[in-house]
Amino acid sequence: MDPVAEAKKYITGNGVRQDCTRGLRLLKGPSDEGNPKAMIEMGALYSAGLCTPRDLPTAYRWFALALRKDPNNQSVQADLEKLWGEMTQPERQLAIRLSQ
């Protein structure tokens, strides 16, 4: 099974008991290995505060990394622009540092 789909099952509790810890662990590996789909999911989780504390700079980081892997992804570009508009100046500075 696709590791991102497997992780999402645990994060949402779809067909299995919700287990954020397991879902995040399943998602982190592919994200760290450069899987853009996993990176987008990580960004979405941090942006929404689902299974993680809401952290816009970290969400921005994951979306920015995903966009580097898939530069034509307009949805990710839109997510980045939306996050940028929601962040304070200190959060933006942190987001830039985290994304380098």
Show the residue positions of the predicted features.
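Short helix-capping/linker turns of helical repeat alpha-solenoids
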Residues: M1-E6, Y10-N14, D19, D32-P36, ...
